[in-house]
């Protein structure tokens, strides 16, 4: 590898400060265009599903190429062979990272959630920037470890929370910091509707199926305990319905819908979480799946001039309450409409937003938005045109990206605290926000860490 290039790009990780400000601090440069910097060479771990989508978003920027790619499902690699013929192809990413060391400037991790942590730990050996799919990991302890390793090794990182690069994110923060709406009181967020994507029949877990042709099932399982293949896991991504691989609707979407509110209000970790399910979800009977009509209640402590704050999450078949300020002539049925979004109730007004990055942010009803528009605060925080180009330019310019693990990890952990509450329906779990341990139900702490194989724990347990 060319030494100058190595020093210019890959060596840039050493120039990144260890501390990264939560809630979207300004970066050194915001997507400078027209630069003549070297293209970033990506080592791609996972090329199907979101991997296919995000890698194409990287390529469309014109700032990168794929130098090598690994996927455990052979058909996922066909497009790479055709569109990036220079890329070396692998099934096992560990072999790829080792054999191609020095031939890539950044790593993308777009695997199922249960493999994020070990893939990052492996990539961290090579001290190159890392882009990782959301949620950042599969458990709280994995997430904390990834944040710590990135911080200690000064690795440039970005989480695929693309909403953080959309204009609604800084806009909501500016609105709330202005004080024009008064103090925030509570948020109500809804997601997924009657979505079978998160509602697989529990009995499928006891009906083993044959893995599809081209899938290396052993490699796909990565660090977790071995089980027979369940139909539908690959290639359509139905693994999110199963607790050993994914985190259901809340784990999948929390960064998109908790992130904007947490950023705008500068929320610390919740100190209590409660889950109830209208359909009588019993985790003892169905320990591998998730509730189909859940409501989560996150309690955040008072901070500064803001009092205690309650964040409500409704998913799948659970209807969110109609906001009192919503236009009376418009229908509001979060299940029938399959909406993803939410509303933030403040002392003076109610704000409504969409599925990612507080998209479509507005005051409700429309008449209030029209009246208050002339009084809205000016822009204060940077806007980003492209989440993927932002990461690549951060690599080129040797600076932090706008959604590092320090930020994306906090959003991930907030959602995962709800995941733990899922296993204790109707019980209020209290948490120590410093130790990140449950203080009133000791058995909940057994769910903080991963259920790895002995081999995985021997290899990567030192990171936890």
Spans of model-derived segments:
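Short, solvent-exposed turn/loop segments enriched in Gly/Ser/Thr/Pro and often Arg
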Residues: 73, 110-115, 136-138, 143, ...
């Amino acid at each position: 590898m060319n030494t100058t290039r190595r020093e210019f790009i890959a060596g840039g990780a050493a120039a990144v400060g260890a501390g990264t400000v939560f809630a979207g601090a300004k970066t050194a440069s915001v997507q400078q265009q027209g630069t003549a910097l070297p293209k970033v060479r990506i080592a791609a771990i996972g090329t199907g599903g979101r991997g296919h989508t995000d890698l194409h978003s990287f390529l469309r920027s014109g700032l990168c190429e794929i130098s090598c790619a690994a996927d455990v499902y052979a058909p996922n690699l066909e497009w790479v062979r055709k569109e990036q013929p220079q890329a070396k192809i692998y099934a096992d990413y560990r072999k790829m990272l080792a054999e191609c060391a020095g031939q890539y400037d950044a790593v993308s991790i777009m695997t199922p959630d249960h493999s994020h942590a070990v893939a990052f730990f492996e990539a961290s050996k090579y001290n190159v920037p890392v882009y990782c799919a959301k949620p950042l990991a599969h458990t709280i302890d994995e997430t904390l470890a990834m944040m710590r390793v990135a911080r200690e090794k000064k690795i440039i990182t970005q989480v695929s929370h693309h909403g953080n690069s959309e204009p609604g994110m800084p806009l909501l923060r500016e609105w709330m910091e202005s004080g024009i709406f008064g103090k925030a009181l509570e948020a109500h967020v809804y997601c997924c509707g009657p979505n079978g994507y998160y509602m697989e029949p529990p009995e499928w877990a006891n009906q083993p199926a044959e893995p599809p042709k081209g899938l290396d099932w052993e490699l796909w399982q990565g660090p977790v305990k071995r089980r027979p293949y369940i139909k539908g896991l690959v290639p359509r991504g139905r693994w999110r319905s199963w607790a050993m691989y994914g985190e259901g609707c809340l784990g999948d979407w929390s960064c998109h819908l908790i992130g904007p509110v947490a950023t705008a209000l500068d929320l610390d970790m919740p100190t209590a979480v409660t889950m109830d399910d209208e359909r009588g979800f019993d985790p003892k009977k169905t320990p591998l799946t998730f509730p189909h009509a859940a409501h989560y209640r996150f309690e955040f402590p008072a901070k500064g001039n803001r009092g205690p704050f309650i964040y409500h999450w409704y998913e799948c078949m659970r209807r969110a309450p109609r906001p009192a300020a919503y236009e009376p002539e418009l229908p509001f049925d979060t299940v029938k409409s399959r909406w993803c979004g939410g509303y933030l109730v403040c002392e003076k007004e109610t704000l409504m937003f969409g599925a990612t990055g507080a998209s479509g942010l507005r005051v409700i009803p429309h008449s209030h938005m029209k009246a208050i528009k002339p009084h809205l605060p000016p822009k204060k925080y940077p806007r980003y045109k492209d989440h993927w180009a932002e990461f690549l330019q951060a690599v080129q310019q040797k600076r932090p990206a706008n959604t590092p693990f320090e930020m994306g990890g906090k959003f991930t952990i907030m959602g995962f605290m709800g995941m733990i509450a899922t296993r204790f329906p109707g019980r209020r779990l209290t948490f120590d926000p410093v130790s990140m341990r449950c203080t009133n139900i000791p058995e909940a702490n057994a769910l903080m860490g991963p259920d790895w194989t002995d081999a995985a724990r021997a290899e990567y347990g030192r990171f936890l």
